[in-house]
């Protein structure tokens, strides 16, 4: 039996993956497409964890002088012998990943950027011994190795011209223009916005990119990647022959993320074909250009788990690899209309929106419409069908992302409940005192505020679980009792048992879903019969609690009916 290749979980270095013989999904067609389409500066925007860094590493390995050409043996690009002969290993390459450029202050972030650039410059120490560089040029190189410790204006100038200078020195040495690869170009802007120095970072990046990409006679071409397409006016002012390829573009639509065929092949290679449906439900659903795309981070992680443990279940790998503050901000800002639209999304329906692909970070929170756009570009939403008149039909792509929305909706509702002390107190006192009108009134108010996650096609049991979660969220905020959920009692499981501080008192609650408002009364009757027939009060009586109230609560959409009986 052929030994299975190791899966590259967490590996983003192409050379490392190939030399260690890890499994590699061939994306080398990207090289061919770049050279055929030819733009001086190319920006690819895709959600995080969609293979951007690995693709950039692959480009570096292909073009850089001195590359090991055997890395590409057997891959798609090796079939194009003429292209490989002309371009493989023929260029100096500058490769920067800006994902680590962060700091609580602008000075800290700038220092991180200086060290990053200096670290890349140190790869070219052979320039110090180059016969093609004169004394002054070698001194310029020495300055670039250490960009720190200068006066403010000197440091700013050196940093601004650093990439242009090193590409000029590389040209002097090789007689060949430089390829510049900048991965995660927008991370410093995102961090700067979060920490309050956005304008300073925009000015820094604009200056650096302007010199490296716009007025650089020693540039062959550049490739940048990021999550957001920051508006050209803020960063890329004046760049000619500048192309942006977003998730909406047909060109390069299969080069980031896995296609259906690639996922099938991967599962076949590990004899896991039977898991295809669940992989598709959980990790597919992204529509890039004309292609249906899976999140590669998820697929690789899940296959790796299955190889280790055959009974592994799908997990939210992509979601757990970063925070999900964006969805939280979106829900926090939602008005009644937006809450209704979120309900549509969560139950699998589409919402039509006009999307802006060129926002700046400081515009994101200006309006709920801008957040719709960012949710699309960052992968929390995807398009369903063709774009018509600038309007996108947006859907949640898969089960994994739906889990994020559900989690954030629950957290948001918990916060709503925690902040409304008067209503929760009224509900809780109502349960203790048998005041069904108070309970019904306040519960209906909360139901009106919440975001329903109920699919109309869901089974009654699933709908009851939803309302059960809402009621538990309200009851657990009251310190006056212990809340027991789905506890075995008598001949079955009671939905909710409440044990107040008074040791003589106990409360049993049974929930039912009604298909129409006319059925609420009958649903309450069924709930009450179930409490009695299955002796749900047994656990409470065993505790010595004999002053018992039983509640039957029926729900229909955002209305409810409450009845009570003394047991």
PLM ranges: what are they?
Residues 1-80:
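Walker A/P-loop-proximal flanking segment of P-loop NTPase domains
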Residues 179-183, 207, 220-227:
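Structural recognition of the conserved hydrophobic beta-strand(s) that form the central parallel beta-sheet
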Residues 232-237, 245-304, 341, 346:
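Amphipathic alpha-helical segments of the small helical/lid subdomains adjacent to P-loop NTPase cores
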